[in-house]
A protein has these predicted regions:
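Active-site Tyr-X1-5-Lys
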Residues: 131, 146-172
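NAD(P)-dependent short-chain dehydrogenase/reductase
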Residues: 161-217, 222-226
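Rossmann-fold cofactor-recognition segment
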Residues: 48-61
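Conserved Rossmann-fold NAD(P)-dependent oxidoreductase catalytic core, especially the SDR/UDP-sugar
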Residues: 103-147
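N-terminal Rossmann NAD(P)H-binding glycine-rich loop of SDR-like oxidoreductase domains
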Residues: 1-26
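Mid/C-terminal beta-alpha module of Rossmann-like enzyme folds, strongest
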Residues: 201, 228-286, 326-327
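NAD(P)H-binding glycine-rich loop region in Rossmannoid oxidoreductase-like domains
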Residues: 59-97
Length: 330
């Protein structure tokens, strides 16, 4: 089984690579080769029985996608994207990377020929939905995004559905919850503060909160996100029928509830490292995001996530902090 990971240098790409190398198989088949691709250098890969190669390049550049699929990988994880805040700030870059790059990949797959139809797992987003919202958004709710990022993801969902319908590939679009708590340095995603206000205080640093504590959002841990990707790849798009986009399980909670969970686990002094500093641009973007979902379709297929935000924090402590946190005197 040959695997291609596009966007392999990102947080999910790294964790997915680690998971695949550690397990050595997917869908009951041994993994013989993993090709990692990104516009930046990927970190050194973990030890693996599979042959691991790494390439740098831009999927939106002519010929790059054709080069990647020439080896006919069996499963393709397409994780690469310009994130929400950056896609809103740089209109041309967002469409070039998020839409043109994806279209290039789909066309490259289509032109391989010889009955080649790989399984494609695409990371979409709950940003494909726009207000006004019902109390809980199901998969049947209209995709009407209110940001450039959400629009780009929604267009790609339609393309993947059509290319799957035509038999060029076996694709599925995963409407991922906001992944929290993201390790490492903050990125340019407008949603980054959801992770920052947990990760930084746990590491002994102050964090900025740019929105009100009443803001509600939909979360899942990086561990759950990797499990979503692997389960989708093993399941295949046929399980989704004609509707190839699916909203994945998560946890709906307010920023205030996040901070209550942080204090319960790490103490009041750690909670007090979060400082309110309103940012009108971020507040405007977040105000158009959905808050709660009915993921019963995904759950019926076996997808699972955390049951509480305390669980999400504990996953971060276990996976990123060696099971312990830095505290200060109360």
């Amino acid at each position: 089984m040959q695997i291609l990971i596009i966007g392999a240098a990102g947080m999910l790409g790294r964790k997915l690579t680690d998971h695949l190398c550690r397990n050595g198989q997917i869908a009951g088949q041994p993994i013989t080769k993993i090709l990692r691709h990104d516009v930046v250098l990927c970190p050194p890969p973990p030890a693996s029985a599979a042959a691991i190669s790494t390439e740098m390049g831009d999927l939106s550049v002519a010929g790059e996608a054709e080069r990647l699929v020439a080896a006919r990988p069996d499963i393709i994880f397409h994780l690469a994207a310009v994130v929400s805040g950056e896609a809103e700030a740089d209109f041309e870059k967002g469409y070039r990377i998020n839409l043109d790059g994806t279209r290039n990949l789909l066309e490259a797959i289509r032109h391989v020929g010889g009955n080649y139809a790989p399984r494609l797992v695409f990371t979409s987003s709950i940003a494909v939905f726009g207000s006004p919202f019902p109390d809980a958004i199901g998969d049947e709710f209209l995709a009407s995004p209110l940001t450039s990022y959400g629009t780009q993801k929604a267009i790609c969902e339609l393309l993947i559905s059509d290319y799957s319908r035509r038999g060029f590939l076996d694709g599925m679009s995963l409407r991922m919850p906001t992944v929290c708590v993201r390790p490492g340095l903050p990125n340019k995603a407008a949603s980054g503060f959801f992770s920052n206000i947990i990760r930084e205080p746990l590491a002994g640093n102050d964090a900025v909160l740019p929105v009100d504590e009443t803001v509600r959002h939909w979360h899942a841990s990086p561990r759950s996100a990797v499990n979503f990707l692997v389960q989708a790849a093993e399941m295949g798009g046929a399980a989704l029928g004609a509707r190839r986009a699916i909203t994945l399980p998560g946890l709906s909670c307010t920023v205030g509830e996040q901070l209550v969970a942080l204090e319960k686990i790490a103490g009041k002094a750690v909670r007090q490292r979060v400082k309110s500093q309103p940012d009108e641009n971020i507040r405007r973007i977040v105000a158009g995001w959905p808050q709660n979902f009915d993921a019963s379709r995904a759950k019926s297929l076996g997808f699972r996530s955390e049951n509480s935000f305390e669980d999400i924090i504990r996953v971060h402590i276990e996976d990123e902090l060696g099971g312990s946190i830095k505290t200060v005197q109360q």
